[in-house]
């Protein structure tokens, strides 16, 4: 049984899906498509020799990790990939803190990095998950600063809650590590 069928209670649409919200199966496909695009791009880096999909392994499921990257010098790092279809137009990262009373992926991942992939533009932001959690915690404590920076709590669909964080704000913090484009130059927006 794979990770997704294990977590999905029913093959029926949720109430939110029936009301015109996103569709779980479509979101899952979009996420997997995004992961494959990013995986191919990672393999193109000269220092990378392999990108292993561990998302359905015990470690991948328990630690919420999508890929293990193997480098030429022998070291490895792990990544959780988030594919976002709206960030290019909203200008926000979506930090899902809770989903159906469970910690959201950014709140629970043990990956070394979050690769936040903007599907429409190909931009991939490399974020530090520990520092991202700390940053969100600080914003929850300093509501005035959060308001000034336009970071806001929001519902994110049925059973989900989190924060919208402006991309430009996060890029100026130590959460942001670097950025690259997943698409060949000819396809970049």
Q: What is the predicted function of each stretch?
A:
Residues 2-56, 85:
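Acidic-basic catalytic patches of nuclease active cores, encompassing PD-(D/E)XK
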Residues 33, 62, 109:
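Short, well-structured alpha-helical interface segments that form or flank functional binding sites
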Residues 21-25, 50, 82-124, 129:
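Catalytic cores of nucleic-acid endonucleases
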Residues 52-73:
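Active-site metal-binding core of divalent-cation-utilizing nuclease and nuclease-like domains
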Residues 2-10, 14, 22, 26, ...:
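Non-catalytic C-terminal interaction segments of nucleic acid-processing enzymes
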Residues 42, 67-69, 73-87:
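Conserved catalytic cores of phosphodiester-cleaving nucleases, focusing on short active-site segments
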